[in-house]
Amino acid sequence: MITHDPQLLALRALTAPLLGTEEPLTHLNEISLSAQGAAVCGHVLIDLLEENDLAIGDYEVVIAPEGDGALAAAMIHAAGGRGLDLDAALLRPTQATASDASFTGAPIHGRPAVLLANSSLVDTGALREAVEAAGATVVGVISLLPDPSTQDFARESGLTYCAPSLAD
Protein backbone atom coordinates (compact mmCIF):
# COMPACT_ATOMS: atom_id res chain seq x y z
CA MET A 1 0.00 0.00 0.00
CA ILE A 2 1.46 3.36 -1.03
CA THR A 3 1.29 6.03 1.65
CA HIS A 4 2.44 9.58 2.13
CA ASP A 5 1.77 9.53 5.89
CA PRO A 6 5.07 10.66 7.46
CA GLN A 7 4.44 8.72 10.70
CA LEU A 8 3.76 5.47 8.87
CA LEU A 9 6.76 5.99 6.59
CA ALA A 10 8.94 6.55 9.67
CA LEU A 11 7.53 3.40 11.30
CA ARG A 12 8.26 1.38 8.16
CA ALA A 13 11.86 2.64 8.19
CA LEU A 14 12.25 1.76 11.88
CA THR A 15 10.71 -1.71 11.57
CA ALA A 16 12.29 -2.78 8.27
CA PRO A 17 15.42 -4.28 9.91
CA LEU A 18 13.47 -6.30 12.47
CA LEU A 19 10.90 -7.63 10.01
CA GLY A 20 13.68 -9.53 8.27
CA THR A 21 14.58 -11.39 11.46
CA GLU A 22 13.16 -14.72 12.61
CA GLU A 23 11.94 -13.20 15.88
CA PRO A 24 10.80 -9.62 15.22
CA LEU A 25 9.14 -9.36 18.62
CA THR A 26 12.45 -9.78 20.42
CA HIS A 27 13.65 -6.59 18.73
CA LEU A 28 10.46 -4.58 19.15
CA ASN A 29 11.69 -2.98 22.39
CA GLU A 30 14.64 -1.55 20.46
CA ILE A 31 12.08 0.59 18.66
CA SER A 32 9.47 1.20 21.34
CA LEU A 33 12.03 2.21 23.97
CA SER A 34 13.79 4.79 21.79
CA ALA A 35 12.66 8.43 21.76
CA GLN A 36 11.94 8.54 18.03
CA GLY A 37 10.45 5.07 17.90
CA ALA A 38 8.12 5.59 20.86
CA ALA A 39 6.76 8.82 19.41
CA VAL A 40 6.16 7.27 16.01
CA CYS A 41 4.64 4.05 17.41
CA GLY A 42 2.23 5.88 19.71
CA HIS A 43 0.94 8.18 16.98
CA VAL A 44 0.61 5.39 14.40
CA LEU A 45 -1.37 3.19 16.80
CA ILE A 46 -3.78 6.01 17.74
CA ASP A 47 -4.13 7.06 14.09
CA LEU A 48 -4.99 3.48 13.09
CA LEU A 49 -7.71 3.29 15.70
CA GLU A 50 -9.13 6.64 14.55
CA GLU A 51 -9.09 5.48 10.92
CA ASN A 52 -11.18 2.52 12.06
CA ASP A 53 -13.72 4.72 13.88
CA LEU A 54 -12.29 4.22 17.38
CA ALA A 55 -11.31 7.63 18.71
CA ILE A 56 -10.01 8.30 22.20
CA GLY A 57 -13.22 8.66 24.14
CA ASP A 58 -14.61 5.53 22.50
CA TYR A 59 -11.92 3.87 24.60
CA GLU A 60 -10.40 5.26 27.79
CA VAL A 61 -7.70 2.73 28.50
CA VAL A 62 -5.30 0.59 26.50
CA ILE A 63 -4.65 -2.81 28.07
CA ALA A 64 -1.62 -4.89 27.20
CA PRO A 65 0.48 -7.76 28.49
CA GLU A 66 3.44 -6.51 30.54
CA GLY A 67 5.79 -7.08 27.61
CA ASP A 68 3.97 -4.40 25.61
CA GLY A 69 4.15 -1.76 28.34
CA ALA A 70 6.46 0.48 26.31
CA LEU A 71 3.94 0.60 23.46
CA ALA A 72 1.09 1.35 25.85
CA ALA A 73 3.18 4.20 27.31
CA ALA A 74 3.90 5.45 23.78
CA MET A 75 0.15 5.67 23.17
CA ILE A 76 -0.34 7.61 26.42
CA HIS A 77 2.30 10.16 25.41
CA ALA A 78 0.96 10.47 21.85
CA ALA A 79 -2.53 11.11 23.24
CA GLY A 80 -1.16 13.69 25.67
CA GLY A 81 0.59 15.44 22.79
CA ARG A 82 -2.84 15.81 21.20
CA GLY A 83 -4.35 17.21 24.38
CA LEU A 84 -6.23 13.97 25.08
CA ASP A 85 -6.30 11.69 28.10
CA LEU A 86 -5.56 7.99 27.74
CA ASP A 87 -4.70 5.55 30.49
CA ALA A 88 -3.05 2.15 30.37
CA ALA A 89 -3.08 -1.04 32.38
CA LEU A 90 -0.82 -4.05 32.06
CA LEU A 91 -1.77 -7.66 32.63
CA ARG A 92 0.67 -9.33 34.97
CA PRO A 93 1.72 -12.83 33.93
CA THR A 94 -0.23 -15.48 35.80
CA GLN A 95 -0.85 -19.18 35.65
CA ALA A 96 -4.29 -18.75 37.19
CA THR A 97 -7.69 -18.37 35.58
CA ALA A 98 -8.92 -15.17 33.94
CA SER A 99 -10.94 -14.26 37.04
CA ASP A 100 -7.70 -14.32 39.05
CA ALA A 101 -5.84 -12.06 36.61
CA SER A 102 -3.99 -9.11 38.05
CA PHE A 103 -3.54 -5.73 36.40
CA THR A 104 -1.18 -2.91 37.20
CA GLY A 105 -1.67 0.69 36.15
CA ALA A 106 -4.89 2.63 35.71
CA PRO A 107 -8.19 1.26 36.99
CA ILE A 108 -10.12 -0.56 34.26
CA HIS A 109 -13.44 -1.47 35.89
CA GLY A 110 -16.37 0.03 34.00
CA ARG A 111 -14.20 1.48 31.25
CA PRO A 112 -14.08 0.87 27.48
CA ALA A 113 -10.73 -0.59 26.49
CA VAL A 114 -8.56 -1.41 23.51
CA LEU A 115 -6.38 -4.53 23.72
CA LEU A 116 -2.80 -4.11 22.54
CA ALA A 117 -1.59 -7.52 21.40
CA ASN A 118 1.61 -7.96 19.42
CA SER A 119 2.26 -11.63 19.49
CA SER A 120 0.71 -14.95 18.74
CA LEU A 121 2.43 -15.92 22.00
CA VAL A 122 -0.25 -13.87 23.77
CA ASP A 123 -3.60 -15.62 23.99
CA THR A 124 -5.77 -12.68 22.98
CA GLY A 125 -8.91 -14.58 23.98
CA ALA A 126 -7.57 -15.14 27.49
CA LEU A 127 -6.50 -11.48 27.66
CA ARG A 128 -10.00 -10.37 26.69
CA GLU A 129 -11.55 -12.77 29.20
CA ALA A 130 -9.34 -11.39 31.98
CA VAL A 131 -10.13 -7.79 31.02
CA GLU A 132 -13.87 -8.45 30.98
CA ALA A 133 -13.67 -10.38 34.27
CA ALA A 134 -12.10 -7.22 35.75
CA GLY A 135 -15.10 -5.22 34.56
CA ALA A 136 -13.83 -3.46 31.42
CA THR A 137 -15.49 -3.58 28.01
CA VAL A 138 -13.24 -4.46 25.07
CA VAL A 139 -14.04 -2.32 22.00
CA GLY A 140 -11.07 -3.12 19.75
CA VAL A 141 -7.73 -4.85 19.27
CA ILE A 142 -4.54 -3.28 17.92
CA SER A 143 -1.11 -4.66 17.03
CA LEU A 144 2.02 -2.85 15.93
CA LEU A 145 3.18 -5.98 14.14
CA PRO A 146 0.37 -7.53 12.10
CA ASP A 147 -0.59 -10.94 13.47
CA PRO A 148 -3.00 -13.26 11.62
CA SER A 149 -4.09 -15.13 14.76
CA THR A 150 -4.94 -11.89 16.57
CA GLN A 151 -6.77 -10.63 13.49
CA ASP A 152 -8.77 -13.88 13.33
CA PHE A 153 -9.62 -13.60 17.03
CA ALA A 154 -10.87 -10.02 16.59
CA ARG A 155 -12.96 -10.90 13.54
CA GLU A 156 -14.51 -13.93 15.26
CA SER A 157 -15.26 -11.77 18.32
CA GLY A 158 -16.82 -8.97 16.29
CA LEU A 159 -14.11 -6.52 17.35
CA THR A 160 -12.27 -3.96 15.27
CA TYR A 161 -8.69 -5.07 14.53
CA CYS A 162 -6.03 -2.55 13.53
CA ALA A 163 -2.43 -3.08 12.44
CA PRO A 164 -0.24 -0.95 10.19
CA SER A 165 0.76 -2.09 6.74
CA LEU A 166 4.52 -2.32 7.18
CA ALA A 167 5.22 -3.40 3.62
CA ASP A 168 5.80 -0.82 0.91
Indicate where each model-derived feature is located.
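PRPP-associated nucleotide enzymes
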Residues: 1-168
